[in-house]
Amino acid sequence: DVHKRQIYYGDLPYEKLEEVSPARDTFDLMVLKMAADRNIPILGICRGLQLMNVAFGGTLYQDLPTQHSSSVKHRQEESGTTPTHPISIIKESKLAEITGQEVLQVNTFHHQAIRKLAPGFKITAWAPDSIAEAIEAYPIRQMIGVQFHPEIFTAAGDTTMHKLFKFLVNKADTFHLAKKIHSRILSIDTHTDTPLWFKNGYSVGLRKDNMVSIQKMEEGKLDAQFLAAFIWQGKRDDVSSQKAVESTTLLIQSIYDEVAKYKDFCGIALTEKDLVRLKNEGKKAFFIGIENGYAIGKDLKNIKKYKQMGVNYITLCHSYDNDICHSSTHTEDATQGLTQFGREVVKEMNRLGIMIDISHASEGTFWDVIKYSTQPIIASHSSSRTLCDHDRNLTDEQLRALAKNGGVAQLCLLDTYINKTPKAASVCDAVEHLDHMIKVAGIDHVGIGTDFDGGGGLQGCKGDNDLINLTIKMIEKGYTEEDLRKIWGGNLLRVMKQVQEAPLFSLKKRR
């Protein structure tokens, strides 16, 4: 039995508990949590199913004979190879997909069972007496649990039960391949709002509730992350604009201070060479971006200041119009684009080698930037408007124009941008967006920008540790290692290098 302590059950201990082992419970639950954090495929059998449920917040019938009236004897006296009752399998479940069955005859050797189901799981098979016989957490986690013992049937030659183990091995092989690929490529998430949380005591060196941390990056096999110095849009008078500059400067400095605390595990990256060096040293890399050109204030000289502070891109606006351009969201006119000052900002960013980010920009702004920028541009966190009609997403026409420009569109993992029913948005939907964007723009012009700690997060991808799931889903769709190399960082690094080298090329031409 699972130990009677309330922390495991979520309810009070019951007198009919049988033999327990607190040491085994502690070990099993620790292994289960560590495996789940890393998205390792898991198959739980009998007690394993029960542990899954209590580990993630469910409860158990602690003694079926006295707590649940039943027509089924769940402790059979027959041998394990003898099936003693049927189970009904939910048609749309992973278990039905694996076995190809809607009814299975199973054995039964338990006196505990699921009472209250843990959040994030669904029951996928029932016994005739309404006892849950199987659960799964797909696509949130790669976890399946069964109350019966398929290993006994499999050892006796049952080919249907054997499919469960083949499924687990295949999932493990794909997981292993995903990790191997990540060890050989450079993986970058181009947008997080994590610095907003520093003032609340959050640290990138601690694995807590925030989506971004060094530990989670390692679990998800992510090499680098852009930390955005985000500034809310405020009043546009001289005094307010100057305060925005000062606030942004402090935010950027806070990124340096935070990374310095964990210099043995991470570092600031300005170029691809920095990223390669840090990866070879076994460290994570943090690039710096600015979200909202309001941070520039009224003076173009601030762009040079930010360049000297290591800023690699500036998102021209956020959810409201500013002195640079019109926003896609709260705007006077989405067809309007760059202001005269905005055109000067684009020119100066080109001159200094800072990437121009058009996420959050109106369509008018997008087309103006395409027209006036001499360098490729990026959308650091935007998805497909064809699949989810939201003003923050890019139309197919925009995606094609971005590709022609040589730029890159980075898939955003914010549920509202991914699915018309946000709560249902999952990693599977995200890969559908990615797939569509690649079909429209081409494999050389798409990447990933999660928007973690700023609204991003979907079922199956709620933090850095879950990013390996994107890779797994892409492998299952047939994407090659070379494809993944481009999507996860190669495309963005190509644009960044071209933009950074443009000022040097211009200087050589003048000489």
Regions found by a protein language model. Give the residues of each.
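Short, small-residue-biased leader/transition segments that mark boundaries at the very start
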Residues: 2-3
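Amide-donor transfer/coupling interface in amidating biosynthetic enzymes
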Residues: 21-40, 65-179
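Alpha-helix-loop-beta-strand connector modules within alpha/beta enzyme cores
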Residues: 28, 334-352, 369-379, 440
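Histidine-centered catalytic micro-motifs
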Residues: 106-112, 146-150, 187-194, 311, ...
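Glycine-enriched alpha-helix->loop->beta-strand junction motifs that scaffold or abut catalytic
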Residues: 140, 221-222, 311-313, 352-354, ...
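N-terminal hydrophobic targeting/anchoring segments and the immediately downstream early-domain regions
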Residues: 177-333, 389-448, 452-511
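Substrate-binding cleft of carbohydrate-active enzyme catalytic domains
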Residues: 344-369, 395-407
